[in-house]
């Protein structure tokens, strides 16, 4: 008789222990993974920003005698870029940007690693926006010079970085 009560007591105790045992909740693991993703996204944005700034600073170098020629080429900017998916518009213009940089190479002006910069920018853009290329860019009616083009994308990156949670 006592063995039956003891067995019931042990069973109830085990049930209580199992149900009250702390476990990792799905929200805490998803929160930590989303935090890691946000940090990685922040790092990619900062890398993109640095690459664009470095490219712009090399182009604006006082010894760049080819800059007036580079300013004749026109680039298109999105009407309103506010989200990471809008980086598709930047990716669409990387080919023409590479062409302009290749055309303006000379002995007096070398954009060392221009191809490397474009490649890094392309890889970073794909990491940020994803590999989905189905988004069609709505370009602004007015074109921009290469300097304005880079400045606008730099401002875009700074805006996204400043509004993202730290």
Swiss-Prot record:
**Signal sequence: where?**
1-20
Tell me which residues are glycosylated. Answer: 23
Q: Which GO terms describe its cellular component?
A: extracellular space
Q: Which Pfam families match?
A: IL2
This protein's UniProt keywords = Adaptive immunity, Cytokine, Disulfide bond, Glycoprotein, Growth factor, Immunity, Secreted, Signal
Here the disulfide bonds are 89-137
**What subcellular compartments does it reside in?**
Secreted
Q: Name one GO molecular function term.
A: interleukin-2 receptor binding
| Chief place of localization | secreted
UniProt-listed GO biological process terms = adaptive immune response
Q: Which domain of life is it from?
A: Eukaryota
Name the family the entry cites.
Belongs to the IL-2 family.
Q: What does this protein do?
A: Cytokine produced by activated CD4-positive helper T-cells and to a lesser extend activated CD8-positive T-cells and natural killer (NK) cells that plays pivotal roles in the immune response and tolerance. Binds to a receptor complex composed of either the high-affinity trimeric IL-2R (IL2RA/CD25, IL2RB/CD122 and IL2RG/CD132) or the low-affinity dimeric IL-2R (IL2RB and IL2RG). Interaction with the receptor leads to oligomerization and conformation changes in the IL-2R subunits resulting in downstream signaling starting with phosphorylation of JAK1 and JAK3.
Q: What is this protein called?
A: Interleukin-2
Q: What is the protein's species of origin?
A: Mus spretus (Western Mediterranean mouse)
Name of the coding gene: Il2
């Amino acid at each position: 008789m006592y063995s039956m009560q003891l067995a019931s007591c042990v069973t109830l105790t085990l049930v209580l222990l199992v149900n009250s045992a702390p476990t990792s909740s799905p929200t805490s693991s998803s929160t930590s993974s989303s935090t890691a993703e946000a940090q990685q996204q922040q790092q990619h944005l900062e890398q993109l920003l640095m690459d664009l700034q470095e490219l712009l600073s090399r182009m604006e170098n006082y010894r760049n005698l080819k800059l007036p020629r580079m300013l004749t080429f026109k680039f298109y900017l999105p009407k309103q870029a506010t989200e990471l998916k809008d980086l598709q518009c930047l990716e669409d213009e990387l080919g023409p940007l590479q062409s302009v940089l290749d055309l303006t190479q000379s002995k007096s002006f070398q954009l060392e690693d221009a191809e490397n910069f474009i490649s890094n920018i392309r890889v970073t853009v794909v990491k940020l926006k994803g590999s989905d290329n189905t988004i069609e860019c709505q370009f602004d009616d007015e074109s921009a010079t290469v300097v304005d083009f880079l400045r606008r994308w730099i401002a875009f990156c700074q805006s996204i970085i400043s509004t993202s949670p730290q």
